[in-house]
Amino acid sequence: MSFAFKTGRVSIRTIRRMNTRSSSRCPFHADAAGAAPALHPPGAWPPGPRAGLTGWRLLRAMSRDLLGTLAGWQRAHGDVVHLRMWPEHAVVVTDPALVRELLVAQHDALVRWERGIRVFSQVHGHSVLIAEGHAWRDKRHAMQPNFMPKPVQAFVPSIAATAGHALAQWPAHDAHWPIESALTSLAMDVIMRTMFSDAIGANARVAEAAVRTISAAANAEFYQPANAPDWMPWKRGKARALAVLNGLIDRQLHARLDVPEHGWPDDLLSRLLRLHRADPRTWPLQAVHDECMTAFLAGHETVAATLTWWAWNMAAHPAAQAAARDEVVRVLGGRAPTADTRAALRYLTQTLEETMRMYPAAPILISRRASRPVALGAWQFPARTLFMLPIQLMHHDARWFPEPAAFRPERFGDDAPAIPRGAYLPFGTGPRVCLGQHLAMTEMTVAAAMILQRHALSVPPGMAPPRASLNVTLRPERALHLAIAPTSPAANAAAS
């Protein structure tokens, strides 16, 4: 439910070499004498790669492999890296304390990167994802009640029923099951039922294809100085995909309006439509449409991407899969997950948390523009500095996560060493923290538990580990297929 800054192919191998030396050491880390470092004078910039005349070669490098390129610059120059890309001064920040300082303590000095907002607004309109200032606060206040922990607990029976219906369509055996597509359909159906009280049904495959097309178009547009009109011949696919998604949302909206208000279900769509009827100037139907689009796209994509990588981790690590399944069988005792039992699935939750460390759905947060001068650590940055926040580099940093390439769910156990604040941010932090994080964690835990009740996951013979690709969210470069088989009789009894 967060979104990335830019896109490109991800070199996980490059990121895994990240036993980083920091030449721009965080001033919040006290030295031996406990003395704070001196501030650099205004106008001084942190170290960074040579930019050449325009710095556009840096942009080209990022367009080829964004995360791998940023990881290399971090190794060479430290946790605060200056990129001079005319006309921009961009600063890449990968120190947890400084990232948290920006997103929490200095959030009011930052606005979201204009180019990213222009690209996303083509799909999301002027929703809470796009808005700033008072408009953002009003929209978030309107949306938040549906995503608080207590309302989310009430969704658990619906989530479990939806997951059960979806999993009933899976075959008992398949040596090459398209698990990524199946999990995406499941996530779409859950968000449709919880937010709009309807099923995705036959629209799932068409909607999935449309989302992929829109994501690919966004990838290209992040690196272009301006957007060509959608009626240009090479953008017809994007226009058709937008029409599919807009039609999906508009059908929900108008079907609800055709029903008397006293018959409306208690869901997000009804809440937004009541705001429209109470104040149509502030909440025109287009505003309702925009919020519904963001709820659908952000609401399913983070879950689908994370469950896809979780399924890979389970298949690639049979011992962890067996431990998680044993816990599911012990805790649920033949029942479907409930709000009460979900909290007891601690090891299963750790497998999801470790998956989000290794493969955060949004590995780079939307960049922030300083609206005024910002003092950050030892540096004093002028207004209009652009801050890039690649959280995946922190998630793969051996200083915070020893052996970062290893899948180790015990990192998140109760007895594990504390993770530095700001080092683990799968949902972001600060006032802009992901609105749907409670719903996402609940949905993923319920779905994962029910998968393990029914299916054993394994890697097909000869299959290489999937390569990650950043298309707004982090997905396998090629659609993930895994082998599935029925679980043991004890686990099957739990699923019945």
Model-assigned labels for residue ranges:
Residues P373, L389-A416:
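Conserved cytochrome P450 K-helix/beta-meander segment immediately N-terminal to the heme-binding cysteine loop
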Residues P47-G52, V156, A160, A209-T213, ...:
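Cytochrome P450 I-helix active-site segment
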Residues D138, M293, A298, A336-D340, ...:
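Cytochrome P450 heme-thiolate "Cys pocket" and heme-binding signature region
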Residues T302-Q321, R325-E327, H438-Q453:
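Cytochrome P450 catalytic-core helices
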Residues S2, G8-S11:
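Intrinsically disordered, low-complexity segments enriched in small polar residues
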